[in-house]
Amino acid sequence: QRGLPAITDKWKRAQAAIDAGADLVFELPFYYAVQAGEIFAQGAVRLLSDLQVSSIICGSEHADIDFINLAAHEPDISGNSNFDKKNRTFASNYAAALEEKTGFYLENANDILAFSYAKAILNQNLTEKIKLRTISRVSADYHDQFLNDGEIASATAIRKALSEGQNVDSYTPMSDLQYTDYEARLFQLLKYRLSTDGLGQIRSIYQVNEGMEYLIKQAIEKNPSDFGELLALIKSKRYTFARLHRVLVYILLNIKVDQMNLAMQNPYHRLLGFTEKGRQYLHEKKGRFNFPTISHVDQKTANKSLAIDYKAGLVYNQIMDYKSTQDIKRTPIQS
């Protein structure tokens, strides 16, 4: 969702999940993962439903809230001039409208994602099949910038601490994490792409609309010195930083609208790791999933079914200076 490279690759994260007790680990594909919260949640619920889960558990700042009931009162603010006149962002208008209907003001990051999961469960008519359960987010807020004295920290704080050379072993089960100056490498790749692509090429990229291509082109022509300056030159009230991060990644990977739509129409389950219990579950459910399960990737699969994820993996390795492949010939972790 952040539109930024993960600080360590999916295989190390999958191993950490297995070590922590997970029996099956699947990758949320790029076309659902690098998205706004609503599409992220819709995609996750779609895949988890096909895997026949009975519950989805997520963190929330207000774990006592019934998010399914809250989502059932989703407001429609389209064409509502009372909100339009207040010159607020869509998110602020939406939260205000929801508060008018329910008394709850939706503003915290994890609450918003839990609400998105609830909407996805409702929209896909899964309330009888999947229960949404939330656990309280404690000790660290999503946006916290600094490590605290306990053993729980936000991902933002962990990233920042790593960039400053601090040890974060007590805050994550993944030991020996190394910080890579991904912003500098990401910026160099982006600078080349944005300098050589014309307006038409940028306009054809997924999620580039409302004249955003002009803002982006004007920004790069001002010769920004780094990634942060590039973002500042593009930023406006209309676009969040997360939205801009994602769009710049789409541009870097040259992902067109039709490519993204085609990928979403052909979902799959990418298996990253399993235990014996997980293997037994897959064996019991064999032939009962609608979407294919991919455990081994050859060049043909990489170029076809996994085209976007494969390309993202190649660029990720360049940015993070990883030598091992992310996809070709990689097999699921077994425990």
Residue positions per predicted region:
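N-terminal capping/interface segment
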Residues: 1-3, 23, 31
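N-terminal catalytic cores of NTP/NDP-binding nucleotidyl/phosphoryl-transfer enzymes
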Residues: 1-13
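Functionally constrained cores in energy, signaling, and assembly domains
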Residues: 8, 16, 275
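Short low-complexity stretches enriched in small and charged residues
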Residues: 11-16, 86-90
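A glycine-rich helix N-cap at a beta->alpha junction
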Residues: 15, 19-29
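Active-site cores that bind ATP or allylic diphosphates and position pyrophosphate for catalysis
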Residues: 28-335
